[in-house]
Design a protein with these regions (language model features):
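Short, aromatic/His-centered strand-loop micro-motif at the edge of beta-sheets
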Residues: 105-126
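Extracellular glycan-recognition modules
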Residues: 46-105
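Flexible, acidic glycine-rich loops studded with aromatic residues
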Residues: 1-56
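Short solvent-exposed strand-capping/beta-turn motif centered on an Asx-Ser/Thr pair
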Residues: 76-80, 134, 177
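Short strand-turn-strand beta-turns centered on an Asx-Gly dipeptide
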Residues: 109, 139-146
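Short tryptophan-centered beta-strand motifs in secreted/extracellular beta-sheet-rich domains
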Residues: 71-73, 123-140
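Flexible glycan-contacting loops in extracellular carbohydrate-active proteins
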Residues: 146-184
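Beta-strand-rich interaction surfaces with strong enrichment in secreted/lumenal proteins
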Residues: 58-63, 113-119, 157, 171-173
Length: 190
């Protein structure tokens, strides 16, 4: 949206490109030299990164992937301590076992969001996390099992409310100290 606002605020005169065409073309622009706040990987939708095996305590080539993504991997679960991280970046953490309940989850901006799903020791599964600017989804073996979408939260004795948006720019920079076997990591830009 920033590109659209910039055009309107700079001049807004003699706009000859229809909005739909402009909106499509603006996504091809970079944010600024050396900046990637949107977490873009690759130029087009499709598979943008893959790794046969993910090992603990490693640095990966990308910091994160931004909205409209799918990250999938195969897992053979092990007994993970609460707080076990799978991936992290400076902005977020994705947990194999969150620090409170031991479920799959993620933390960002000081908030912990958990899925109602735990990887059990010995369990074989294909896990997928997909996200956009409104919702983060958990896929298990190709099926969506939970969606963390916008919640209305009330405060001031219920008189006021705000929307809590449970989204995630998926962290990829570093792997955690986990025991489970993680293979077939695939990152898609959708």
């Amino acid at each position: 949206a920033l590109q659209t606002l910039a055009v309107k605020m700079w001049t807004g005169k003699q706009v000859t490109t229809p909005y739909d065409s402009f909106n499509e073309q603006r996504n091809l622009l970079s944010e600024a030299p050396g900046v990637n706040q949107l977490g873009r990987i690759g130029k087009a939708p499709g598979l943008v990164y893959e790794q046969a095996a993910v090992t603990p305590n490693r640095t990966l080539p990308y910091r994160e992937i931004g909205y409209n993504y799918l990250v999938s991997f195969d897992i053979k679960g092990a007994d993970e301590a609460k707080g076990t991280e799978l991936f992290r970046s400076p902005d977020a953490v994705f947990y194999l076992s969150d620090p409170i309940s031991g479920m799959l989850g993620f933390a960002r901006d000081g908030y912990l969001n958990t899925f109602n799903y735990r990887i059990m020791p010995g369990e074989h599964a294909t896990v997928g996390i997909s996200g956009d600017n409104r919702v983060t989804r958990l896929h298990i073996n190709g099926k969506i099992v939970e969606e963390l979408n916008i919640q209305k939260r009330f405060y001031n004795g219920g008189k006021d409310s705000m929307n809590y948006v449970r989204t995630l720019v998926f962290p990829l920079q570093e792997t955690g100290n986990f025991k489970s076997q993680i293979t077939n990591l695939k990152v898609y830009r959708q």
